[in-house]
């Protein structure tokens, strides 16, 4: 049982302190009495860097953990994407290493928060460990950011420069089970990917003016042909080792309008 939350400011300056406060407030809104750990990921001092802060206990313990780092909370960000997570331990016991967010590597190239159950995580973990990836947790989630990195690195080696959403499609095709997830990456600063299968996920957009109307483009796999079909690159059938692209159809449609009365 988990709750995930993300916050993005785009071309609207926010300080690091404001961003952290928003992420914490989002977690507090999701917090349930049985939740026993939480964490956030935010941009570091450099553009292409991500920092992770997490702790067992209530969200108040996470706030205390963050304060230990004496961060410059006045540092401004014109654009920024942060993600957060709170959980009750299921896969993996109650220890800090099992808290989300989980990363792909010590440099935090890919960072993921996840709600759901990846039923084939044991097979994915065995495959990735055989490729040299080191797992720090007992969770099913940790295979996701490492899968991101493996497919990203393999694609670069093969000469394919994938964007974030195409890369995500490759990752999702390997996952079995249910998920609502958010992913950020140092390779794609100021971007966040949100995906769901089975688990709930809600996207909200705040308007700039009264009665502002916004839309979000949402990609669906294997939908009816009355939606716009896009040809995007993905790997051939088989396991994660295959990264040579072939074409498949996805469908793009706009969300219902977000109408704001600010």
Curated annotation (Swiss-Prot):
Involved in amino sugar synthesis (formation of chitin, supplies the amino sugars of asparagine-linked oligosaccharides of glycoproteins). Residues 2-262 form the Glutamine amidotransferase type-2 domain. It catalyses: D-fructose 6-phosphate + L-glutamine = D-glucosamine 6-phosphate + L-glutamate. Its EC number is 2.6.1.16. Pfam families: GATase_6. The active site is at 2 (nucleophile). Pathway: Nucleotide-sugar biosynthesis; UDP-N-acetyl-alpha-D-glucosamine biosynthesis; alpha-D-glucosamine 6-phosphate from D-fructose 6-phosphate: step 1/1. InterPro entries: GATase_2_dom (IPR017932), GFAT_N (IPR047084), Ntn_hydrolases_N (IPR029055). This is Putative glutamine--fructose-6-phosphate aminotransferase [isomerizing]. One of its GO terms (molecular function) is glutamine-fructose-6-phosphate transaminase (isomerizing) activity. The lineage of its organism: Eukaryota, Fungi, Dikarya, Ascomycota, Saccharomycotina. It comes from the Eukaryota. One of its GO terms (biological process) is UDP-N-acetylglucosamine metabolic process. Keywords: Aminotransferase, Glutamine amidotransferase, Transferase.
């Amino acid at each position: 049982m988990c709750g995930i939350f993300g916050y993005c400011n785009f071309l609207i300056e926010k300080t690091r302190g404001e961003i952290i406060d928003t992420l914490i407030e989002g977690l507090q809104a999701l917090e349930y009495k049985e939740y026993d750990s939480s964490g956030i990921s935010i941009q570091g001092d450099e553009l292409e860097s991500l920092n992770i802060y997490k702790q067992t206990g209530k969200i108040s313990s996470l706030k205390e953990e963050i304060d230990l780092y004496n961060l410059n909370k006045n540092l401004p960000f014109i654009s920024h994407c942060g993600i957060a997570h709170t959980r009750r331990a299921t896969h993996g016991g109650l220890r800090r290493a099992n808290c989300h967010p989980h990363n792909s590597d010590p440099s935090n190239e890919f960072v993921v928060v996840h709600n759901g159950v990846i039923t084939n995580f044991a097979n994915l973990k065995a495959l990735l460990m055989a490729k040299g990836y080191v797992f720090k947790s007992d969770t099913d989630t940790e295979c996701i950011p490492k899968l991101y990195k493996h497919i990203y690195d393999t694609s670069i080696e093969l000469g394919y420069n994938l964007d974030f959403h195409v890369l995500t499609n490759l990752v999702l095709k390997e996952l079995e089970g249910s998920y609502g997830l958010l992913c950020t990456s140092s390779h794609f600063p100021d971007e966040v990917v949100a995906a769901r299968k089975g688990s709930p996920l809600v996207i909200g957009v705040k308007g700039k003016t009264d009665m502002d109307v916004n839309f979000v483009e949402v990609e669906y796999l294997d939908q009816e042909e009355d939606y716009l079909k896009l040809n995007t690159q993905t790997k051939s059938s088989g396991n994660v080792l295959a990264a040579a692209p072939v074409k498949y159809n996805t469908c793009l449609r706009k969300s219902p309008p977000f109408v704001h009365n600010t």
